Amino acid sequence: MSAATAAAAASGIQSTAGAIPMRNEKGELSMQKVKVQRYISGKRPDYARADSSSEESDDDDFIDTRKRLERHKAERHKLELSRQGGSAEGEERAAGEGQEEDDAEVDDPRLRRLRQRPVDMEDMERERRERHRHIHEPEIMESDSEDEEEDEGAQGAIQRGTNKITLASESDTDAELSDTELENRRTKLRSRMLQQQREEEVLQKEDEKQSESSESESSEYEEETESEEDNEPRLKPLFVRKRDRATIQEKEREAQKQKQLEAEAKRAAKERRRATLRMVEESVKKDLEKTKPETNEACIEDVCTDDENDEVEYEAWKLRELKRMKRDREERDNVEREKLDIDRMRNMTEEERRQELRQNPKVVTNKATKGKYKFLQKYYHRGAFYLDEENDVLKRDFAQATLEDHFDKTILPKVMQVKNFGRCGRTKYTHLVDQDTTKFDSPWYAESSSNIKFHNEHAGGMRQQFDKPTGSKRKKME
């Protein structure tokens, strides 16, 4: 609970709506009403000054546009009645209406300022000009005789534009002034415009005279321009970066153009060289076509057969043909014999097939001795082809060391005793014997009768049974 509420409760006040506790001169608390100042758009608050300067009047005060127009209409109506010389009743009625409006508008600060304005028309004109914007007309410092007429036309257009602007600005203030003031203002404007026209005509005549005498006064004109240039205000020096300077940019452009010209010259030289090569090629082709015979048929005279003996060549051909026929027949017989052997071996049982291989082993014509491999030597398999051919190349020892295998790798450290050491294809292991964990002293590997019996009965692949399982056995297994 706040202090104000506690004080109100202590003083016996039951309701505090729209009132606050206040302490009087005697020190007693009492509830006093609070006057709430409502905000009204356009109304001057009580704490603001009633009169303000002419500069702040346009922003501080606000009067409804509709009321201002009605006031101007009433004033104009009163003036019209007075001019027409109406009856006394009309004058009294107009005077009464004007008096009522004046009484109603006495408190308007804008009307008070309007009445207090100076009566002098020149002061009024000066104030009006100060209120409105100023248009700075261009000044022609130097001009040639040819460009003077164009500049005069542009200046006249700007002058007319300024006159229009002043007329438009004056039309806004016409509503606030009486008809007599408006007529006086318009007469002044007309006289000023006439004076401007006369001045323009005088200036045109003077310009024509100056254009005629411009040739004789060229030297004087140059001196005047120099003096004017000296009197001109000096500009502040501005720093320009190196890459933005005109001289650097021009040099870069020249260098770029030079490079382009050199590239174009090289390209043109290449094109000329290609054109000359094409011309030479075409000329050579034309010469060959001229020397070439018209018929494309083969001429037997082109082949020299003076040293040949037809009978000897025929006998050699016959011998080659007989050998070819014999070789083809032997190849066909061998293929048929191999097919018969394959069919016969397929029809044999496993025991018969083993016995047949023991009695008739495969004959290797070019069988080579088995070589000895070094530590970490790369192994190459001989393969199963060309075993029945008599050739010295096929009988060579292919287990000999090559390239890096000539070196003894047993003297290397343990870390380096791997294949492709230091490469992406490096292996972790050296050989299978090194990784073998078989314990030959274990009783599982002892050659006892019980181990041999167990191995023959239960070891995988020891039973030679290759019977195809029947459907009944498969069902039982399922």
UniProtKB/Swiss-Prot annotation:
<feature type="compositionally biased region" description="Acidic residues">
    <location>
        <begin position="53"/>
        <end position="62"/>
    </location>
</feature>
<feature type="compositionally biased region" description="Acidic residues">
    <location>
        <begin position="140"/>
        <end position="153"/>
    </location>
</feature>
<feature type="compositionally biased region" description="Basic and acidic residues">
    <location>
        <begin position="107"/>
        <end position="128"/>
    </location>
</feature>
<dbReference type="GO" id="GO:0000398">
    <property type="term" value="P:mRNA splicing, via spliceosome"/>
</dbReference>
<dbReference type="InterPro" id="IPR033194">
    <property type="entry name" value="MFAP1"/>
</dbReference>
<dbReference type="InterPro" id="IPR009730">
    <property type="entry name" value="MFAP1_C"/>
</dbReference>
<feature type="compositionally biased region" description="Polar residues">
    <location>
        <begin position="160"/>
        <end position="170"/>
    </location>
</feature>
<dbReference type="GO" id="GO:0010389">
    <property type="term" value="P:regulation of G2/M transition of mitotic cell cycle"/>
</dbReference>
<feature type="region of interest" description="Interaction with Prp38">
    <location>
        <begin position="229"/>
        <end position="478"/>
    </location>
</feature>
<feature type="compositionally biased region" description="Acidic residues">
    <location>
        <begin position="171"/>
        <end position="181"/>
    </location>
</feature>
<dbReference type="GO" id="GO:0032991">
    <property type="term" value="C:protein-containing complex"/>
</dbReference>
<feature type="region of interest" description="Disordered">
    <location>
        <begin position="1"/>
        <end position="276"/>
    </location>
</feature>
<dbReference type="GO" id="GO:0005684">
    <property type="term" value="C:U2-type spliceosomal complex"/>
</dbReference>
<comment type="function">
    <text>Required for pre-mRNA splicing.</text>
</comment>
<dbReference type="GO" id="GO:0071011">
    <property type="term" value="C:precatalytic spliceosome"/>
</dbReference>
<feature type="region of interest" description="Disordered">
    <location>
        <begin position="456"/>
        <end position="478"/>
    </location>
</feature>
<keyword id="KW-0508">mRNA splicing</keyword>
<feature type="compositionally biased region" description="Acidic residues">
    <location>
        <begin position="214"/>
        <end position="231"/>
    </location>
</feature>
<feature type="compositionally biased region" description="Basic and acidic residues">
    <location>
        <begin position="197"/>
        <end position="212"/>
    </location>
</feature>
<keyword id="KW-0747">Spliceosome</keyword>
<keyword id="KW-0539">Nucleus</keyword>
<feature type="compositionally biased region" description="Low complexity">
    <location>
        <begin position="1"/>
        <end position="20"/>
    </location>
</feature>
<dbReference type="Pfam" id="PF06991">
    <property type="entry name" value="MFAP1"/>
</dbReference>
<keyword id="KW-0507">mRNA processing</keyword>
<protein>
    <recommendedName>
        <fullName>Microfibrillar-associated protein 1</fullName>
    </recommendedName>
</protein>
<feature type="compositionally biased region" description="Basic and acidic residues">
    <location>
        <begin position="245"/>
        <end position="268"/>
    </location>
</feature>
<dbReference type="GO" id="GO:0071013">
    <property type="term" value="C:catalytic step 2 spliceosome"/>
</dbReference>
<comment type="subunit">
    <text>Component of the spliceosome B complex. Interacts (via C-terminus) with Prp38.</text>
</comment>
<comment type="similarity">
    <text>Belongs to the MFAP1 family.</text>
</comment>
